[in-house]
Amino acid sequence: MKKILVVEDEEGLRLLYEEELKAEGYDVLTARNGREAIQQLEQGKPDLIVLDIVMPVMDGMEALGRIVGKERKIPIILNTSYPGYREDFMSWAADAYVTKSADLTELKGKIRELLEKKGKNRS
């Protein structure tokens, strides 16, 4: 079972993502901010990370920089309500960029795509 780390400060969204991704057959870990995400990484590597950008304690851009510096092989999807971040230089380090929506179809599709790509790169 593929393991996904969802990093989201809004509890309602975090629970929605967790529920929806578990229904898709994924093992889901959650974190409320970038610092918790880094701690989760130290406990075990997920197969993919869904990362919010605007969060307290440590924002997604700082977390992205730290994660990429340590674990470049883990695909990262930036997931935010603010489409302007797509232009941020640091966001280019992510594997995908998805604007938040109550409909998780795009996010789920991007997760499948990146996990399939990661699986092919291992072969």
Walk through the language-model features, giving the residues of each.
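Hydrophobic/aromatic residues positioned on beta-strands within the core alpha/beta folds
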Residues: I77-N79
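Acidic catalytic/metal-coordinating carboxylates
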Residues: N33-E36, D59-E62
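Active-site residues of response regulator receiver
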Residues: D52
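Receiver (REC) domain active-site loop signature in two-component systems and cognate sites
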Residues: M55
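Short hydrophobic/Thr-rich beta-strand motif most characteristic of the beta2 strand and flanking loop
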Residues: G25-R32, Q40
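Charged docking surfaces used in two-component/phosphorelay signaling
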Residues: L15-A23
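Alpha4 helix (beta4-alpha4-beta5 surface) of REC/receiver domains from two-component response regulators
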Residues: E62, Y82-G109
